[in-house]
Amino acid sequence: MGYSIVNILGGLLIVTSTMVVVSKNIKHAIRWYVVQSLVLVGLLATLGATTGAQELLMWAGSAFITKVVLVPYILNRAYKKMGEPSDASLKAGLKPAWAICIIAVEVAICFAVVTQISLPTAEVATPALAISFAHFFVGLTCIISQRNIMKQIFGYCLMENGSHVTLALLAPTAPEIIEIGIATDAIFAVIIMSIVVRRIWDDSHSLDARDLSELRG
């Protein structure tokens, strides 16, 4: 029963990731990222209760602080500091329908790969493990397909969430220090990327990647 819930929550992760990718503006993307992070916290807590790994319960707590609270706060603050720019609703390079199809293919490929892996977790949590692997490609799709450079930050966040779930599934008893390292790395990366985006906005008053091809270091 426990792993069934984990797999269901894994399914919700890919749904929320898709919504982040196809969101039309930054505010909606932030809200969907918060929802995904809450699902991630629930997945970690459920997996911890199922496996008896107390470490995962601690992971769930730290994930709530970093992913549900801190990262959205940093992104929202950066967005407001720029005055909520009008081009925050730039259309993506891919239409939503195409993005959904690409994500579906990525999940299917990862599912096919995971079914060939002979690990205990792969046998009981195949969907969740496949989805965690797929998040790397979903994040990459987000980065490549978005014209809005702030929206591209979410691609990194999705990739990081996927690696988080993969580690939890494959090494549920890993020391808490590993989780702290992952979370700290993610927070500082988001802070740095947000600062860079704000500097670009201050200099060019545009978040459109197509307007930034002439930038020089």
Language-model features, listed with the residues they occupy:
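Alpha-helical transmembrane segments of multi-pass membrane proteins predominantly involved
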Residues: 1-217
